[in-house]
């Protein structure tokens, strides 16, 4: 025993000595490669001192002898002063150990290398000459010496040098012949000196000196390649590298690329010998081989013997599968296990050694930490062996790996061990009994951070999502292993039956921790578990409500949004709305529902009759609204709550949509549902609780500082409503239980949604897209599908134009706001209190308000938004009431600019606030409460009391009633306005005469139009879909869809009709808005000018044009309804899309209604004038046929025929001027209506044949004189005509220069005698007068039709002569 111990000690000492020698060699070569001469000399000197004490280190001496030529020739020759400067080098140089070698080197160095180089040159020339003549080589230096080996052993240094050079020159010639294939590869060169090991000591000195002194005639690369053909190439290449560190890369490159010349095995031996120089060489060679993807066995051998980083190399192979596929394929070959098995044995030995050390040294924390990391890395490699390399682990490796699971120091790596259990093939068959495997899994549940991971894996097993298990293992290991399906199923069976049953999983998920500030950077498993359980409906199966957990996690989230949160909320909505599991006891379910329905019937029977009547009224509303196209504005009265009527088959139910009010029947149903939902014996399907409105609002208020929570809450609400709409749409005609419909399928009402900060959330996610990347697409879809009014393209374009406007950068910033604002605010900015006080003094201090508005306009939208409510409440009423004052009128433009900037950010709240202000303003006595306004009126109106008395005397009862009806003082809600957008037209009349304010009104109108349309569509989808599925029920659903479409069209057409009426607010005396305006603005009757009205017309026509483009069908509906003919010049001129009317004018001409035919002809005449194209000519010919048919047939009565002629004569003159080709046919039609048409035709032919045509001077003078006389009598009536509604096509220019010849032709026309009463007719036909003015100011039935026909023919002919 003592002897064996001594032997072990000796062996250990030898191993230590070998390791120290290797380390010393590494230090020397690394110092040479790095050029660190100080460290090199220091190390050699230390080694020299050690050698003096121990003379047995011959290996060290030999290794150092290799580097001596480099030190003496390569270093000292270049820097001779280094010997005197460096003490370490001086000691080394004068050391007795190296004195002989140094002396020999100096002798070789002292040779005359000029003669040596000439010798080389001569020998090369001789060999080339002999090779050329193919003679035996008898003239070389080596051939002429007898017994050359004796000469080498006993000769002087020059002879030895020449002999070695002769040997090298011959070797170079042999190498060239081998490369050129002039000799066989099997031919060997027998080098007498350089390939003889006994001469290596001398070669150690000669070879480096040849490389330093003789490279002029010997190529270094060729020399390196030729050495590889020798038997001791390993040693000579090593010698070259030791003395030529600068050529390291080139030498390695030559060796690796010479496989084809010298063979694979020889290259391996050379490279292994080079690896002995240092670890740097071995790492470099391995890197080169891996990059070239060659010699995989050598790569593994270098790793195990020299580099010794097996774990890192194999990890790289497993992780980078594509790049290291060649290595993977080599390892997977069963016949190549010899090299790889060494690495496996090394890994197994490492695990055994660590296991023993842990057992003996359990208290050494530093070693334990290192050991735990090594074990974790090896276990990860074992997962890769079985999963990627196809290597089945043996029982010893499995056992030693599992033995670390229960070690306390490995608790942080429990996930790696879990992956090992899942990946290891044949694990269940290897471990007996199975209870041990169950124990390992239970231990992983209790220790470490593997509990939630095991729960998630068990969920995947329960839901048969094996691919997700592989993905989970990939995320833990860093690579995707190929898991054996059979082995994985065996583990899954144990996990799901012994540890995590399905019911336990459902209950355990409720207890999962809620992560604070959950975002996408958290690798949280809880949300993944809940998501998969929701998607597979396991919670529903075991009646587990996880809604509270989801809502709590939602309120704890932050940015960037976790990628699973939107999907989690989607699944939660689906589980709340669409339960899929029903109990078999359907009879008990039916009885409970019948009981609930009976209890609720008592509270709803009384309202059913009223609801039925309301439904009938709603059905006929479209017809009533269609008939009312002009004149009045209809609306609804605002109320605190909105009543929603829904119809289910033949039954009708009424429910209050206010979130705080619930009917008695519904409360009974809710209590019944809550009392029976938890009982499995009740037979009711399980439902998760719907999140109430109060919880949602409280969460939003509590998360004012966390916008991500608000966005997620709004996303949930919108997703819930969207799911309800889709579910009810899919269930159309299918039976739905009444209890389900009244509890689960209750969408959040529109009034509640209007209070949510949806618009702000849109701005937030669009400005921070990276933080909300996973929620942006579904969130924008939900908003677009439910609130399309928030995506107004016009507002976006205006905002973009404003941002790109360079003039905005030069806005003057006054100092007023900072001086006055600083009095009330320490920060120097404006507060709402200061702004409110200043706005109250607007009439007395308009300049202050002007400066403040200019300052506010320089703020960003985010900074400007808090002042919006103050501006609207205090400034807008003053602007409306005192718009005629120049000081107030100047404030409109900056106010509107601010309004337009903040409106896209908060459309719903700003629109509602603005409309409530505009509809609640009362001009009578509201201004008396304002002290500043009262002072202003007293200073500027001395007779204010007298004016008020006169105004009161002029008011009558009818006007007071109209004021009460049209301007109610109320507070409209969002639901009120979207139910009837016409409420917007109840705004103060000042808005309709002020272009900036009217522009605001149009934006609000568009917002509520889109909202109303979407609300009607949603009501259609969310209306009760229960029923028996009969044909009559399907027909009823189709009828409801048609009714909603008709209602939307009718609503939009009514809005267009009212807007068109506004265009004539100063043109005609209507009973509509013009009358309202005049009644309400008696104080400021001339408060607007035609320029404002023209601008408003342009705004209206642009708005209508956009509606026509969005829905071309509406243009047909509006024109089939018809409007005043005075609007045609305005619509045709200012609405570019009016050309669409060409498509349906023929259909309009074919209508049986005479009014529609007249309107079609009038519309066609204006369109033809603007669009003189072939298509309009074709339609004009069709209208000509219709006119001829109406006038020449007996279809019309005499009165209708006269009415028809009076209406279309101006249009005929307009058409004939546009298309002269139709003039003759139209003149013929008109002449057919004259009693003396034959005589008229004869005179007309001679009249047309004349070259110049002028009217008779007598007739001209006569008519002009009468016109002047009548113009005085009818001054008021003629001046009221709007010049914008006239058309120059009808103007008659009577020339004063009359040709006598033409006068004779004109006198021959036999006109009917004109009475004095009818002479006024001719007075109207003069310059700048038209048929339209004649028609307006004269009763057409009092004018003989023959006179009008005569005049029309004159106009046609006049137009032809131009």
Curated annotation (Swiss-Prot):
GO process terms (BP): RNA polymerase II transcription initiation surveillance; snRNA 3'-end processing
A GO term from the CC aspect: cytoplasm
Function: Component of the integrator complex, a multiprotein complex that terminates RNA polymerase II (Pol II) transcription in the promoter-proximal region of genes.
Biased composition (Low complexity): 1-10
Tagged with keyword Glycoprotein: no
Pfam families in alphabetical order: INTS2 (PF14750)
Keywords, ordered alphabetically: Cytoplasm, Nucleus
Family: Belongs to the Integrator subunit 2 family.
Origin superkingdom: Eukaryota
Organism encoding this protein: Dictyostelium discoideum (Social amoeba)
Organism lineage string: Eukaryota, Amoebozoa, Evosea, Eumycetozoa, Dictyostelia
Name used for this protein in its record: Integrator complex subunit 2 homolog
Subunit (UniProt): Component of the Integrator complex. The core complex associates with protein phosphatase 2A subunits, to form the Integrator-PP2A (INTAC) complex.
